[in-house]
Regions:
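Outer-membrane beta-barrel signature, preferentially recognizing the C-terminal barrel domain
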Residues: 58-92
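A short, structure-level motif marking secondary-structure boundaries and short turns
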Residues: 2-3, 70, 139-141
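Short sequence motifs at beta-strands and strand-loop junctions characteristic
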Residues: 9-13, 69, 73-81, 144-150
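Flexible, surface-exposed loop regions and adjacent strand-edge segments
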Residues: 11-14, 46-62, 115-126, 184-188
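Surface-exposed loop/interface segments of Gram-negative outer-membrane beta-barrel transport/assembly proteins
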Residues: 36-69, 133-137
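Transmembrane beta-barrel wall of Gram-negative outer-membrane proteins
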Residues: 1-2, 8-44, 87-93
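Face-selective signature of the C-terminal outer-membrane beta-barrel domain
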Residues: 80-188
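Sequence/structural signature of outer-membrane beta-barrel proteins
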Residues: 1-6, 39-41, 108-110, 176-180
Length: 188
């Protein structure tokens, strides 16, 4: 999907895929599935209020240069990639009993990048700048906020059906690891 967007600087470039393969036996079914995608979208998260006469105006990434001219940061974007893998196995053990199992793994990695004005140095773990013996406590900067995650696990169910009675026993075990961190790319 690609779009220039309705709101200024709100374009979208997204790609995705889906692949599935399987084995179908008399009493066995095995399927492998993978799907995922990437996206780069320019930020328009604030939307447009109904009172605003400029219906497509997007304030995100706006700053004023040293001459007081309005400028917009070119890479005010959200960038993310996620991939899923699944392996499913169903086995009919007899006419009354079947077993379903699945393994899954998801990998996600991405960031958003934005221009921030008048931010305190200490918010970003930076020492204040000293210019001509004057300590500056705030600055404009470009930052990235990252999401780096892994999620995997297994599920199962054992199903018994006989004499108008159905019983299911199942469970799952999952593990998630995620890290959120930031990077300062540029400071004025």
């Amino acid at each position: 999907i690609t779009s220039d967007g309705f709101i200024d600087r709100a374009s979208v470039d997204m790609k995705s895929y889906f692949v599935s393969a399987g084995y179908y036996g008399e009493n066995t079914l095995v399927k492998f599935i993978t799907f995922g995608g990437t996206e780069k979208t320019y930020q328009a998260w604030n939307g447009v209020d109904i009172e605003n006469q400029e219906r497509t105006f997007n304030e995100l990434g706006m700053y004023f240069d040293k001459n007081g001219n309005t400028r917009f940061y070119d890479n005010q974007t959200d960038n993310y990639n996620q991939t899923h893998y699944q392996l499913h196995w169903t086995q009919e053990l007899n006419s009354k009993l079947n077993l379903n199992t699945a393994l899954h793994y998801t990998r996600g990695l991405g960031y958003y990048e934005d221009y921030k004005t008048a931010r305190k140095y200490k918010e970003y773990g930076l020492e204040p700048a000293i210019v001509d013996d004057i300590t500056l406590k705030k600055t404009d900067l470009v930052r990235q906020k990252w999401l780096d995650n892994y999620f995997g696990g297994a599920t199962f169910s054992l199903n018994w059906n006989a004499n108008n009675l159905a019983l299911t026993f199942g469970g799952a075990a999952n593990k998630y690891y995620g890290d959120h961190y930031g990077k300062v790319l540029w400071v004025q």
